[in-house]
């Protein structure tokens, strides 16, 4: 067995600097490992804090104002701005909660009601309505990008008939999973009846 020679000692001027860098690196690594952002379970509560209505409306209106290519034909649609609806946000929150409780993404709630039935039950009168759902996306940007990549979801986002929106997500407990793995998203779009 061949023995490796001992490493040459570092020049004395560089040794303290290297020790300080190694110590700093170890402290930084320890601090990051202990920080809430480094732990997946701490990264989960996006739904409770990151969905400010202004940010949601701004993000979706930015897309609607420049148009999106929703079909293979390449036709770009431009649509009027949306406004936040607390009523639609409540419907979206109820659906996200139902999906989390059922541990299943879908357009029907625990009582097997579709969107129109849920809107009516919440007292929202409408002339047009649409819903997008998703699971597993860690941020608003990620889920909107995914919806824009899907023809039918993009059609809903760019639908010129809808004027209002509500969006919600619900974090279900997914032990040891990715931060967004159990995050259920619901976007409800609607338009009040025409007068």
Predicted regions and their residues:
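Bacterial N-terminal signal peptides that target proteins for export
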Residues: 4-24
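Cleavable N-terminal signal peptides
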Residues: 27-28, 38
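N-terminal signal peptide c-region/cleavage motif recognized by signal peptidases
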Residues: 34-35
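A short alpha-helix/helix-coil micro-patch that ends at or immediately precedes a cysteine
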Residues: 41-101
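Solvent-exposed, polar/charged alpha-helical surfaces in well-ordered, non-transmembrane soluble domains
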Residues: 54-62, 86, 90-97, 117, ...
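Bacterial peptidoglycan biogenesis and beta-lactam-recognition machinery
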Residues: 70, 105, 153-155
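Short, surface-exposed glycine/acidic/tryptophan-bearing loops
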Residues: 85-138, 157
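Disulfide-stabilized extracellular recognition modules
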Residues: 126, 130, 134-195
């Amino acid at each position: 067995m061949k023995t490796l020679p001992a490493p040459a000692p570092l020049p004395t001027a560089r040794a303290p600097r290297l020790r300080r860098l190694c110590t700093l690196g170890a402290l930084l690594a320890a601090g990051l490992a202990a920080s809430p952002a480094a732990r997946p379970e701490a990264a989960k509560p996006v739904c409770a804090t990151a969905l400010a209505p202004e940010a949601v409306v701004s993000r979706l209106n930015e897309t609607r104002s420049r148009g999106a290519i929703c079909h293979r034909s390449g036709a770009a649609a431009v649509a009027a701005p949306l406004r936040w609806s607390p009523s639609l946000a409540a419907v979206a929150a109820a659906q996200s909660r139902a999906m989390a409780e059922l541990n299943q993404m879908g357009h029907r709630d625990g009582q097997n009601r579709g969107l129109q039935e849920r809107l009516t039950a919440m007292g929202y009168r409408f002339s047009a309505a649409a819903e997008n759902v998703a699971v597993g996306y860690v941020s608003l940007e990620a889920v909107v990008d995914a919806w824009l990549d899907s023809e039918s979801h993009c059609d809903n986002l760019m639908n010129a008939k809808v004027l209002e929106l509500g969006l919600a997500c619900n974090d279900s407990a997914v032990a040891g999973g990715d931060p967004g793995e159990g995050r259920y998203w619901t976007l409800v779009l609607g338009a009040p009846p025409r007068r």
